[in-house]
Protein backbone atom coordinates (compact mmCIF):
# COMPACT_ATOMS: atom_id res chain seq x y z
CA UNK A 1 0.00 0.00 0.00
CA UNK A 2 1.25 3.47 -0.88
CA UNK A 3 2.51 5.55 2.03
CA UNK A 4 1.59 9.23 1.95
CA UNK A 5 2.61 12.20 4.08
CA UNK A 6 0.53 15.36 4.42
CA UNK A 7 2.27 18.65 5.10
CA UNK A 8 0.90 20.69 8.01
CA UNK A 9 -0.88 23.06 5.61
CA UNK A 10 -2.94 20.14 4.28
CA UNK A 11 -4.12 19.25 7.77
CA UNK A 12 -5.00 22.89 8.42
CA UNK A 13 -6.99 23.16 5.19
CA UNK A 14 -8.78 19.87 5.86
CA UNK A 15 -9.72 21.03 9.36
CA UNK A 16 -10.91 24.39 8.03
CA UNK A 17 -13.04 23.17 5.12
CA UNK A 18 -14.79 19.87 4.59
CA UNK A 19 -15.47 20.82 0.97
CA UNK A 20 -11.93 21.20 -0.31
CA UNK A 21 -9.36 18.88 -1.85
CA UNK A 22 -7.32 18.62 1.38
CA UNK A 23 -10.34 17.17 3.18
CA UNK A 24 -10.97 14.79 0.26
CA UNK A 25 -7.38 13.57 0.66
CA UNK A 26 -8.02 12.83 4.34
CA UNK A 27 -11.21 10.97 3.45
CA UNK A 28 -9.25 8.77 1.03
CA UNK A 29 -6.88 7.88 3.87
CA UNK A 30 -9.82 7.03 6.10
CA UNK A 31 -11.19 4.78 3.35
CA UNK A 32 -7.89 2.88 3.31
CA UNK A 33 -6.93 3.88 -0.24
CA UNK A 34 -3.41 4.64 1.01
CA UNK A 35 -1.51 4.64 4.27
CA UNK A 36 -1.33 8.11 5.83
CA UNK A 37 1.98 8.33 7.68
CA UNK A 38 2.83 10.73 10.52
CA UNK A 39 5.47 11.16 13.18
CA UNK A 40 5.12 12.52 16.70
CA UNK A 41 6.94 15.73 15.67
CA UNK A 42 4.56 16.35 12.78
CA UNK A 43 1.48 15.67 14.87
CA UNK A 44 2.79 18.11 17.49
CA UNK A 45 3.25 20.78 14.82
CA UNK A 46 -0.27 20.18 13.48
CA UNK A 47 -1.72 20.39 17.01
CA UNK A 48 0.18 23.64 17.67
CA UNK A 49 -0.94 25.24 14.39
CA UNK A 50 -4.60 24.22 14.76
CA UNK A 51 -4.69 25.65 18.29
CA UNK A 52 -2.96 28.96 17.54
CA UNK A 53 -5.10 31.93 18.50
CA UNK A 54 -4.11 33.73 15.28
CA UNK A 55 -5.25 30.76 13.17
CA UNK A 56 -8.50 30.40 15.07
CA UNK A 57 -9.20 34.12 14.59
CA UNK A 58 -8.78 33.72 10.82
CA UNK A 59 -10.90 30.56 10.80
CA UNK A 60 -13.63 31.13 13.42
CA UNK A 61 -15.15 27.66 13.01
CA UNK A 62 -11.80 26.13 13.98
CA UNK A 63 -12.35 26.16 17.74
CA UNK A 64 -10.18 24.21 20.16
CA UNK A 65 -12.91 21.56 20.35
CA UNK A 66 -13.03 21.24 16.54
CA UNK A 67 -9.22 21.10 16.40
CA UNK A 68 -9.07 18.36 19.03
CA UNK A 69 -11.78 16.34 17.28
CA UNK A 70 -9.91 16.70 14.01
CA UNK A 71 -6.66 15.52 15.64
CA UNK A 72 -8.42 12.43 16.95
CA UNK A 73 -9.65 11.74 13.44
CA UNK A 74 -6.11 12.09 12.06
CA UNK A 75 -4.58 9.81 14.68
CA UNK A 76 -7.21 7.16 13.96
CA UNK A 77 -6.54 7.33 10.21
CA UNK A 78 -2.75 7.55 10.39
CA UNK A 79 0.12 5.17 10.92
CA UNK A 80 2.89 6.43 13.18
CA UNK A 81 6.54 5.97 12.28
CA UNK A 82 9.19 6.04 15.00
CA UNK A 83 12.00 6.72 15.12
CA UNK A 84 12.52 9.17 12.29
CA UNK A 85 16.27 9.65 11.86
CA UNK A 86 17.53 12.97 10.50
CA UNK A 87 18.94 11.71 7.21
CA UNK A 88 18.40 14.75 5.01
CA UNK A 89 18.79 18.48 5.45
CA UNK A 90 16.77 21.03 3.57
CA UNK A 91 18.51 24.38 3.85
CA UNK A 92 15.88 26.12 1.75
CA UNK A 93 13.28 25.57 4.51
CA UNK A 94 14.55 23.68 7.58
CA UNK A 95 10.97 23.45 8.96
CA UNK A 96 10.25 21.00 6.12
CA UNK A 97 13.02 18.61 7.17
CA UNK A 98 10.78 16.47 9.44
CA UNK A 99 8.51 15.75 6.46
CA UNK A 100 11.41 14.82 4.19
CA UNK A 101 13.02 12.63 6.83
CA UNK A 102 9.68 10.94 7.47
CA UNK A 103 9.39 10.29 3.73
CA UNK A 104 12.74 8.52 3.80
CA UNK A 105 12.03 6.61 7.02
CA UNK A 106 8.61 5.46 5.82
CA UNK A 107 9.50 4.90 2.16
CA UNK A 108 6.67 7.26 1.26
CA UNK A 109 5.38 7.52 -2.28
CA UNK A 110 4.01 11.05 -1.89
CA UNK A 111 4.16 14.21 0.12
CA UNK A 112 0.99 16.24 -0.34
CA UNK A 113 1.51 19.97 0.19
CA UNK A 114 0.82 23.46 -1.03
CA UNK A 115 4.22 24.66 0.19
CA UNK A 116 6.21 26.06 -2.74
CA UNK A 117 9.57 24.97 -1.33
CA UNK A 118 8.40 21.39 -1.08
CA UNK A 119 6.58 21.44 -4.42
CA UNK A 120 9.85 22.55 -6.01
CA UNK A 121 11.30 19.17 -4.96
CA UNK A 122 9.36 17.72 -7.90
CA UNK A 123 11.46 19.76 -10.33
CA UNK A 124 14.18 17.82 -12.13
CA UNK A 125 16.83 20.39 -11.19
CA UNK A 126 16.11 20.06 -7.47
CA UNK A 127 19.14 18.46 -5.79
CA UNK A 128 17.15 17.48 -2.68
CA UNK A 129 14.35 16.13 -4.87
CA UNK A 130 16.84 14.04 -6.85
CA UNK A 131 18.21 12.57 -3.62
CA UNK A 132 14.71 11.67 -2.45
CA UNK A 133 13.77 10.16 -5.81
CA UNK A 134 16.94 8.05 -5.86
CA UNK A 135 16.33 6.88 -2.27
CA UNK A 136 12.61 6.26 -2.87
CA UNK A 137 11.88 5.24 -6.48
CA UNK A 138 8.60 6.73 -7.69
CA UNK A 139 8.52 9.42 -4.98
CA UNK A 140 6.51 12.56 -5.83
CA UNK A 141 5.51 15.84 -4.21
CA UNK A 142 2.03 16.96 -5.27
CA UNK A 143 -0.57 19.55 -4.39
CA UNK A 144 -3.90 18.13 -3.11
CA UNK A 145 -5.79 18.39 -6.42
CA UNK A 146 -2.99 16.65 -8.34
CA UNK A 147 -2.75 13.96 -5.67
CA UNK A 148 -6.50 13.32 -5.87
CA UNK A 149 -6.27 12.95 -9.67
CA UNK A 150 -3.33 10.56 -9.29
CA UNK A 151 -5.08 8.42 -6.69
CA UNK A 152 -8.33 8.32 -8.65
CA UNK A 153 -6.45 7.26 -11.78
CA UNK A 154 -4.70 4.48 -9.83
CA UNK A 155 -7.94 3.18 -8.33
CA UNK A 156 -9.58 3.08 -11.78
CA UNK A 157 -6.79 0.90 -13.19
Language-model regions: role of each:
Residues 1-38:
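Short, well-structured N-terminal submotif of metal-dependent ribonuclease cores
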Residues 9, 40, 115-116, 145:
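Alpha-helix N-cap/helix-start capping motif
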Residues 18-21, 26, 51-52, 124-128, ...:
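Short, glycine/charged-enriched secondary-structure capping and boundary segments
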Residues 28, 102, 133:
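Hydrophobic/aromatic ligand-binding patch that stacks against planar heteroaromatic rings
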Residues 31-35, 40-85:
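PIN-domain endoribonuclease scaffold, especially VapC-family toxins
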Residues 44-45, 87-91, 144-152:
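A short acidic, often aromatic-flanked loop/helix-cap motif at beta-alpha or helix-coil junctions
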Residues 73-111, 116, 120:
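Active-site neighborhoods of divalent-metal-dependent phosphate/nucleic-acid chemistry enzymes
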Residues 106-110, 117-157:
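Acidic, PIN/NYN-like endoribonuclease modules and their adjacent C-terminal/linker elements
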